[in-house]
């Protein structure tokens, strides 16, 4: 089975020996795919999930304590483990050097600040994470969401470090201070 950005951007390059291809988001088809519901050779084109808060929390037990763990470090922090999170999809921008809008379109969707905090508190309580790295295309696409998340993190007194990916022109001094 193939999935991910490649299947959307370059569907003609997928080898014929591949049994299944998912173009789009797989959360609502993955169980049926693994369960053999679809015939071999099918290309599944899924709709965009509009409300990312509606997705269930991932079953972190499947991978958090494995030998090849999804726990990372950050170069500027001695604290670990750091857990990667992806709380949004796509990007509202269309930078000439980037393929994100070609793959996802410019329909940016995101989890709410409340959902993100809930997941962070869960990961802190269950796995004692030291921090989070928001691995997504454009974390501060909604400054309002970033401010709200920062306020919730401060109010909750959760002791973590965190980092995100952004553009220099997307942040200002006020946002940096609360982050």
How should these model regions be labeled?
Residues 1-56:
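Glycine-rich beta-alpha loop elements in corrinoid/cobalamin-binding modules
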Residues 60-179:
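Radical SAM [4Fe-4S] cluster-binding motif and immediate context
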